[in-house]
A protein has these predicted regions:
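A short SAM/SAH-binding and catalytic strip from SAM-dependent methyltransferases
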Residues: 137-153
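A short glycine-rich, Lys/Arg-flanked "PGG" loop and its adjoining helix->strand segment in the class I
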Residues: 154-164
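Active-site capping/gating segments
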Residues: 178-223
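Conserved SAM-binding motif I beta-strand of class I
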Residues: 92-98
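Conserved glycine-rich SAM-binding loop
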Residues: 78
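Conserved beta-strand signature within the Rossmann-like core of class I S-adenosyl-L-methionine
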Residues: 162-176
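S-adenosyl-L-methionine
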Residues: 2-73, 81-84, 88-89, 101-139
Length: 223
């Protein structure tokens, strides 16, 4: 990442942190727990070389170190690698995507540093449909990794059903509103969530591209 792009990313992250602290009592530190397990703020790894891929593996590692196993909706999950990794870690995960796809045949285990073959018979639960807020009634945590057209719906569903969420907003495609001129899409979404009473935090993963995420714990853990 060039120095100018890094400055912009750092400024955006600081803005998101400022927005997040507006929630409730201007302090979110004391509610960072999910199912009794403390949620650790991810260390800033921007000084390290960024990975060109492995974003699902990186998110998987972040999730299992920051949340206890729960029922996950992998929204726009495509081939289902993230869901597969979570299931292997003892979670219940379901892909919600209108276009069913087969799992990849192999992936890189970034912890062990080796390629892992996936059984050709392996499958992940799949709901072949566009995400609807009503789907959230059956899940504890909603995940959207660059899930086009679903970010606002994920936030709305979290409010209605008390789910936690983890999103990596990217393009403003098929969303019900657009950010005002000069306002970043992540800022707009963070502000929207906070205005609805959601306590959220920004975090970063070490991959190239839009690597800033927003997460919120389960509503039951905020009370």
């Amino acid at each position: 990442m060039g120095s100018r792009a890094k400055r912009r990313s750092d400024q955006l992250f600081e803005t998101l942190e400022t927005i997040s602290t507006r929630a409730h009592d201007q302090n979110t530190d004391d509610i960072l727990a999910v199912r009794g397990q403390d949620v650790q703020v991810v260390p800033d790894s921007t000084h390290l070389p960024r990975m060109k891929k492995f974003r699902f593996q990186l998110l998987h590692q972040w999730l299992i170190h920051n949340f206890s196993p729960c029922r996950v909706a992998d929204i726009g999950g495509g081939k289902g690698l993230l869901s597969h990794l979570l299931i292997e870690s003892g979670w219940q995960a379901t892909v919600i995507d209108p276009i069913p796809q087969e799992l990849p045949t192999k992936y890189k285990d970034i912890v062990l540093g080796r390629r892992v073959k996936i059984d050709l018979k392996a499958r992940v639960p799949n709901i072949p449909a566009e995400f609807d807020t009503r789907h959230a009634n059956y899940f504890d945590l909603l995940i959207g990794m660059h899930a086009h057209g679903c970010n606002v719906k994920i936030i709305d569903a979290a409010v209605e059903y008390g789910c936690g969420f983890v999103i990596f907003p990217c393009c403003v495609i098929d969303e019900p509103f657009y950010p005002p001129l000069g306002v970043h899409w992540l800022e707009s979404l963070a502000d929207y969530a906070v205005r609805l009473g959601i306590v959220l935090k920004p975090f970063r993963l070490n991959f190239k591209g839009q690597n800033i995420g927003l997460y919120a714990p389960l509503k039951s853990q905020q009370e």
